[in-house]
């Protein structure tokens, strides 16, 4: 029963199905709805500039899982997501994209290790178009289930975000603040406490471009490589792109109602150390009801 529970949780979180013997395609449909809260949406480092907000979230994905062999599976999905914020409506988002996920299992039984390869692309359209962009992400993960209740994995991720708008305000400095790239590594573990409850932890480190939106500030100005006005948070706020390292610790809990639905909670604590001694923190939490057909 615990193996069935874990398969449900993984599917709801990753839009992926387990490996099955038949060579026919299995249709997938996922729908999520929830709420989120972020204590520092604009990633400001001065307390007077920090802005917090909450949002309603909706997402859906549909596609097919193909059992290529007894050990190999390929999942192809198209997905859509939306975020609607309470205060900062410029962050309201509609995103459309697609994902390809390949999984290989090295042997039989629950203890056999696996490898996961994921490629995804999306277009994000925001109410304030400074953030409009196309995203591409590549991810690789290797993991193993050590008991029927406990598994662990580690992986790496490459991210690229292509900004659609370039509103330069300083001669010689780009206005494509949200033209970003980064690399990250992570380790995660999950434990099924019961037939319904799954707990998880993840630690990650990311190095790459980050964006901080603050009021005009000389300290961050001199270390930025892109600058643009950011009316989302106020007429006197400016978005700055700079290099930084972000450390993230995340705790998760998932409660399965049945074989198709679950309630998922996640809490994340982030710290970013950026060029020029800029340091900022954020805390976020989200609660999502996930359903799979």
Please give the residue ranges for each predicted region:
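Membrane-embedded beta-strand positions in outer-membrane beta-barrel channels/transporters
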Residues: 57-61, 95-101, 137-139, 184-186, ...
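Transmembrane beta-strands of outer-membrane beta-barrel pores
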Residues: 33-41, 64-66, 80-86, 104, ...
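Residue-level signature of outer-membrane beta-barrel architecture
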Residues: 62-66, 102-106, 142-144, 148-150, ...
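Detector for outer-membrane/organellar transmembrane beta-barrel domains
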Residues: 139-234
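Repeated loop/turn-to-beta-strand initiation elements of outer-membrane beta-barrel proteins
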Residues: 70-74, 107-115, 146-154, 195-201, ...
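Short glycine/proline- and aromatic-enriched beta-strand/turn motifs that initiate or cap beta-hairpins
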Residues: 25-67, 83
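Outer-membrane beta-barrel "beta-signal"
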Residues: 255-256, 280-293
């Amino acid at each position: 029963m615990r193996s069935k529970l874990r398969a449900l949780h993984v599917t709801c979180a990753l839009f992926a199905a387990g490996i099955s013997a038949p060579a026919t395609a299995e249709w997938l449909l996922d729908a999520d709805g929830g709420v989120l809260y972020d204590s520092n949406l604009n990633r400001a480092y001065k307390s007077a500039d920090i802005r917090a907000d909450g949002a309603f979230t909706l997402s859906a994905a549909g596609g097919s899982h193909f059992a290529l062999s007894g050990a190999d599976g390929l999942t192809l999905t198209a997905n859509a997501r939306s975020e609607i914020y309470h205060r900062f409506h410029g962050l309201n988002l509609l995103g459309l994209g697609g994902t390809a996920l390949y999984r290989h299992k090295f042997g039989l039984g629950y203890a056999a290790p696996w490898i996961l390869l994921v490629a995804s692309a999306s277009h994000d359209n925001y109410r304030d178009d400074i953030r409009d962009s196309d995203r591409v992400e590549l991810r690789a993960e290797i993991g193993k289930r050590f008991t029927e209740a406990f598994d662990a994995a580690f992986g790496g991720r490459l991210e690229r975000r292509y900004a659609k708008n370039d509103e330069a305000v300083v001669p010689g400095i780009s206005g494509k603040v949200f033209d970003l790239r980064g690399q990250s590594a992570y380790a995660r573990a999950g434990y099924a406490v019961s037939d319904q409850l799954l707990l998880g932890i993840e630690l990650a480190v990311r190095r790459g471009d980050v964006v901080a939106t603050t009021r005009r500030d000389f300290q961050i100005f001199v270390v930025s490589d892109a600058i643009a006005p950011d009316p989302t948070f106020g007429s006197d706020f400016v978005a700055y792109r700079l290099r930084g390292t972000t450390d993230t610790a995340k705790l998760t809990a998932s409660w399965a109602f049945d074989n198709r639905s679950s309630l998922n909670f996640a809490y994340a604590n982030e710290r970013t150390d950026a060029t020029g001694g800029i340091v900022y923190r954020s805390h976020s939490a989200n609660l999502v009801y996930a359903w799979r057909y």
